[in-house]
Amino acid sequence: MEDNKFKSVLLVDDSYVDNLINSKMLEACRFADNITVIDSPLKAIIHLKESAEKGALPEVLFLDIRMPEMDGFEFLEALNAMPEMQGAHVKIYMLSSSLDPDDIKLIGNNQLVAKFISKPLTEKILNAIE
């Protein structure tokens, strides 16, 4: 039996349908042993703080841009300000249907973000993530 690529992944998106599609693709591609889906950026911040305290941060984080409460960029600012995240090795991918050039430029300028990925996740995209 083949092992999954990563131990854990966190998907942060307010869209139920996108979460369903993307989590099914993550499962089908055997991307991670543990897939956590959170539909609120504020809940995700709490989850990450708790995970950091346990030494169990996800290896990969897929983050939507357009969400209520706070957008993906505000989420990244909050994450960057968290002492628990200093020195953490979490690969962050902005996963969005937004093709706004300003968003893509902001992503390119953000050192926390590994890459922008247009929704939905595909097998090809997941296979390219190291």
Where on the chain are the PLM-derived regions?
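Non-catalytic signal-transmission and effector/linker regions of two-component phosphorelay proteins
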Residues: M1-S8, Y16-I21, H89, K115-E130
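Helix N-cap/capping motif at the beta->alpha junctions
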Residues: V37-E50, G72
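Short amphipathic alpha-helix used as the core "switch/output" element in two-component signaling
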Residues: I46, F73-Q86
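Two-component/phosphorelay signaling modules centered on CheY-like receiver
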Residues: Y16-I38
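Alpha4 helix (beta4-alpha4-beta5 surface) of REC/receiver domains from two-component response regulators
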Residues: D3, E74, H89, Y93, ...
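Acidic di-acidic motifs
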Residues: D13-S15, S40, D64
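Active-site beta3 strand of CheY-like receiver
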Residues: A52-F62
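Receiver (REC) domain active-site loop signature in two-component systems and cognate sites
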Residues: M67
